């Protein structure tokens, strides 16, 4: 399956995911205003981190090795069994941490300990996120874009219903819990789809252990841990800096443009893990890898640029439709944010090459570079320009980072 075909399949699921996310954002914005949306931003960041980290964060590794061993049943069984064991063990450990450390987690996210009950509920919900992500990773390894898309579509619809029920029953805390339920409930249709496809026997999912594979997958766990303490922490620190220098309303304004940005970018990036990761995992020759990377960039950069320009033209309509008139101040942030988006997605192509080759050294360097750049530009621009400065820091970070990625790739390509 080509990148374009994978993109078409994932576009349908992404459209539903975007619709779900924007509907949730609209409810939060209308019900709780910029301050409520701003305060929820750190919790949404936690959900994003759990999407990466829950279940040992091995999902890119699962996709890589399933793609690599898809025609070797004995090795494939080891991959799936070891992955199941790691997901079960790590998600259980995460649940214990959330239950026992509910107070400091609440303090770190919200600035008080009033949300301990919510944190303890998330301890259970993240187990659903972990298993759902494992099943999706298996389908991605087989490059089953259709199965992956259908699972996400049905899961998103179930999740929105669960969100609305939680919101009606629990108010603001219920709405926050609903944010976590949306990705967690994908596990239901994903399990049904995997059974229906029959690509692997269910017995393969029985937890087992292979030391060699566990060691290889642990590289991806370390990558996930690094991811969870770099960019998410950087964004939390940026929000706290913005709130301290200005207000939570300013945080909400920046979060508003970020949420719109995240939504439309899913159309482009959703196909990466379905097509790009397994494809790059199978390639071994530099010439073939270079051809695939260049082809992907030629597709991705114009697509994101066109989408970004469209969003910029429709920014006033987007604010009215997706948020409320309380967010009109964010119209000045779009140009800065959207330029950063184009270059960020371009850098993602190089990032997936690093993941496909399980290059831990380059992965750490990439994450630390982004964290450092964000912090440097944020501490310079946020005090001077508020929410606008946050968007400017984002753009400046990815101008520099994309340039670095291109330079490193050219050096790697020229090495013998």
Curated annotation (Swiss-Prot):
Keywords: Cell inner membrane, Cell membrane, Membrane, Transmembrane, Transmembrane helix, Transport. Pathway: Bacterial outer membrane biogenesis; enterobacterial common antigen biosynthesis. InterPro entries: Poly_Biosynth_Transport (IPR050833), Polysacc_synth (IPR002797), WzxE (IPR044550), WzxE_Proteobacteria (IPR032896). The chain crosses the membrane at residues 18-38, 46-66, 85-105, 122-142, 145-165, 175-195, 217-237, 260-280, 303-323, 335-355, 371-391, 392-412. Residues 1-17, 67-84, 143-144, 196-216, 281-302, 356-370, 413-416 are cytoplasmic. Its main location: membrane. GO terms for biological process: enterobacterial common antigen biosynthetic process. It comes from the Bacteria. Probably part of a complex composed of WzxE, WzyE and WzzE. Belongs to the polysaccharide transport (PST) (TC 2.A.66.2) family. This is Lipid III flippase. It comes from Escherichia coli (strain K12).
